[in-house]
Amino acid sequence: MSALRFLIEVDGMKFTDAVKLLCEESPSFIPTQSAKKEKPPFKLPERYCNCRRIRAYLNHRGISDEVITYCISHEILYESVPYHNAVFVGKDESRKARYAFLRGIYEKNGKGFKMEQTGSEKKYSFCIPPERETKRVAVYEACIDALAHMTLEEGKRDKYRLSLGGIAAPKENALIQSERFKKPPDALEEFLKNHPEIKEIEICTDNDFAGRWAKEQMKKHYEGTYQIICNLPEKEGADYADLAKEKKQANKCRDRPLERR
């Protein structure tokens, strides 16, 4: 790269200023430091007066009323305005909301709106608390997977169910170079720091390449300190949200009366 091109493309100088500098017709150029962007403050989306729409949506996805009501009662799930998104709330140890994941209830071509609320801290991700003291935490890639697995387990409240807010994994068959793929999830690290009573980690990531990769990395990192239980969905390529929805549809077909011929 030429000196002129370097000054223009890297230092951001104007062409004329760069030429003058190289010809020693102007004083040395000192690039200005860009100001650090301040992180916007976190604020929960406004609540709607009820949760009727998100309850219907989650029911359709195979999530039981019992599980939905449990989450609403713990103030970690509600319906927002004006778009009626399902809001999954993550809290810190003082029960202060520090994270929110929004999931749209209207889908187009099988895809719906999903985003983390501005200012969210992923280390305080969505977590369903147990009914009583426990030594186990189950970890999932997404909030809805936690609700789905709880539904499939008949609404058991015997462990924490923590969403990791997504996972970092390389593409299949890619050469692994970045250490970021091997870093333990922030949400799980923060949770374990604040819950020294935990002795067991149940890994419930998706049964695809990324989920299996994440499972192996967590297993390597925590094995020896914690008892590791690997509990991925039995179906290849599926997550627990898929299985809950499939079970809902299967039950619907089973309960449908036979048509007369």
Positions of PLM-derived features:
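Non-catalytic accessory segments of DNA primases and related replication-initiation nucleases
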Residues: 1-60, 260
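Terminal peptide-recognition signature
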Residues: 7, 58, 141, 149, ...
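Short active-site loop/helix that positions an aromatic residue
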Residues: 9, 146, 150-154
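Basic, glycine-enriched DNA-binding surface that flanks or lies within the catalytic cores of DNA
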Residues: 35-131
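Short active-site oxyanion
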Residues: 133-138, 199-202
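Conserved mixed alpha/beta catalytic, RNA-binding, or beta-rich assembly cores of soluble enzyme
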Residues: 139-142, 166-168
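Helix N-cap/beta->alpha junction signal
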Residues: 141-144, 207
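TOPRIM fold recognition
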Residues: 151-261
